[in-house]
Amino acid sequence: MGLVAAAATALVLAVTPVQFVQAHGSNGAFAETGGPADAALTSWAVLGLRAVGRLAPGSLAYLQSQEGLLQSTTDVALVALAEQALGAQPETLRARLRSATRPSGLIGESVNSTCWAVLALGQASRATTRYLLAQQAKGGGWSWAVGGQPDSNDTAAALEALRVAGVHGAPVTRGAKFLLSFQNRDGGFELTHGRGSDAQSTAWAIQGLVAAGRKPPRSAFAYLAKLKRADGSYRYSARYVTTPVWVTSQVLAALAKKPFPLAG
C-alpha cells in the first residue's frame, strides 16, 4: 500500500493527535496528505511522537538515508535532533555542525541556525554562547537573523539554546518576559505583533517558557484545545488549516511541556 493510501485508510480511525501523526507515516517516513515524504517533516513527527513517549518505527533508518541530501545548517540540526530522540548518536551530522562554526560563534547562516545547532550538539562553546547573548535585542527577544525584527519563535528557540548552554539570570528572564508579550486575549501566541495567534507559535512559546523555568499560561493550552479537530489534528489557527502533520507534531511536544533537545 502506498504512503497516501495508507494514510487515508488509517486516518479513518485516527481520533488522537498521536494517531493522526502516526497515520501519515509509512516505513518510517512522514508526509502531509497528498504530499511527498521528506526528512524535515519526518523529523518533526519523530520529535512530537517521542515527546509523548511513542515510538517511530523505521524513522531512524529513513532519516539516516537522507543525511547526504541535507543542505542547510538548520535541516542538519533538525534531523540530528530527531535521530538523537530515537536513541542514535548522529556524529556525522554533528561534525557538519561543528565545521559550520565560525570564530564569532555563529553556526551556519543565522541566529536561528545557531540556536538549532546548539540544540543538536547539546552544548555551546563560549564563543557561541557569547554570540547568542549578543544577539538579544534591547526588548529581550531574538530575531531569525542579525538586524531582524525579534519574534516569538526565534526567542523561544534562543531560550531553549541558552538552557543547553547553561545560561541563567537576566538574559533568560528578559527573554521570557518578551516572549509573554506575544500572547493574545484568546490565549494563543503570535509570531509577530499584530499577526494573530497560531498553534505553532503557541507551541514554541510553551517550550521556550519551560526552558526558561517559567510555567506556561494555562490559557495557552486552552487555546490549543480549541484548535483540535475531530480527526485528531490541530488547525494552524482559528482561520486556517494547513500542514496539519507538522502543526500537530509541534503541538505534541508542547503539550508534553518538553523543550528541545529531547532525551534519547
In which residue ranges do the predicted regions lie?
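Secretory targeting and sorting signals
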Residues: 1-14
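Buried hydrophobic core positions in alpha-solenoid tandem helical repeats
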Residues: 21, 63-66, 97, 132, ...
